[in-house]
Amino acid sequence: MVKFADESKIRVSSGKGGNGCIAFRREKYVPMGGPSGGDGGRGGDLIFEIRRNMRTLVHLRHKRVYKAKNGGGGEGSQRFGKKGDDCIIPLPPGCVIKDPETGKTILDFGDAEEGRFVFLKGGNGGWGNCHFKTSTNQAPKTALPGQEGETREIIVELNIIADIGLVGFPNAGKSSLLDYFTNARPKIAPYPFTTKIPNLGVLRVDEERDVIIADIPGILEGASEGIGLGIRFLKHIARSAGLAFLIDLSDDNYLRAYDILCKELESYSKELAQKKRIIIATKLDLPDTKERFTELKNAIPDQEILGISLYNEWGLEEVKKAFIRLADEMQKTKPQKESLDPYGQNKNFMTAELDDVSYEEKNDDEHFGATVSLSRKRKPKK
């Protein structure tokens, strides 16, 4: 059986910070050099990287535990430890991170097609003993251990991002329509449930525009109660700009088909059921279908209904224009999203405008260094 990897449970951890060092300066003619232990390095971060060329989560099936490297320990002469290597997990666009216990969404990447996002920060490195020198303790033998990293179990869920989602009963012609308009080559055969996994195709409009079309397995009556394959994959068209309902005119239940599909979508998600749509009546080349097409338009007068025949290539240009129009309409009404800041990095740091930056160099036979001083601009009192 063909399996589509659209969900995976994994354990992720950031790295532990390196331990601070206890060391003392030991040089000739410097009998009491004082502490010189450096700080530990920061642990590596756990990072998700969105890659536009990925389509499934199959790579997460083979490995379930991901951990960033720990930071290196501090060393003498106030040398800091090495920062731990980050752990980067590649993901396809449209992923959502969920809590396995509550099912709540922790992080939604939205429509991002590329970029890196820190999910777990590495632990801070521990202080070396040079931080603990005081007027009464000139040779401290104290250092701090590195901060522990974070560990979480999460569910990574993939929701395919498409402009148009194709919805219909098995053998309604969804895969054939996808094959005609795009370079996708889904399996096409004259028996139900030929499509077992979602398929994506790209309808090329011009040099700057594409329309992404998603084909999911056929939906049966009672799908919301677990019958058939299609209901499991409805989440993959939940983010689509609009829906195309395909109704087979050669099926005797063609008049009930639209109502059944609407009912199953509403049972799954009211938001999905309210999306803009067009109705495509297929197999218009078969006997008695032209009369049925007229009856269908009379039965659903408030919806746009287009008739097509893939065999004779009737009405396909009108369907193409309808897909482009629907995608363009939703793009214009799409709200502008703020840039994703999943870990709140921008809120954890204080920013300041600097009024003056100065430094003083010290360079003699044994030492080289610099003292840097920063002065902050003060806000005027109101």
Swiss-Prot record:
Question: Keyword set for this entry?
Answer: Cytoplasm, GTP-binding, Hydrolase, Magnesium, Metal-binding, Nucleotide-binding
Which residues of this UniProt protein bind GTP? 168-175, 193-197, 215-218, 282-285, 309-311
**Pfam families recorded for this chain?**
GTP1_OBG, MMR_HSR1
> What range(s) does the OBG-type G domain occupy?
162-328
Which cellular component appears as one GO term in the record?
Answer: cytoplasm
Q: Which domain of life is it from?
A: Bacteria
Could you tell me where this protein is found in the cell? Cytoplasm
Q: Which HAMAP family match?
A: GTPase_Obg (MF_01454)
Any idea what job this protein has?
A: An essential GTPase which binds GTP, GDP and possibly (p)ppGpp with moderate affinity, with high nucleotide exchange rates and a fairly low GTP hydrolysis rate. Plays a role in control of the cell cycle, stress response, ribosome biogenesis and in those bacteria that undergo differentiation, in morphogenesis control.
Q: What is this protein called?
A: GTPase Obg
Organism field: Treponema denticola (strain ATCC 35405 / DSM 14222 / CIP 103919 / JCM 8153 / KCTC 15104)
> Taxonomic lineage of this organism?
Bacteria, Pseudomonadati, Spirochaetota, Spirochaetia, Spirochaetales
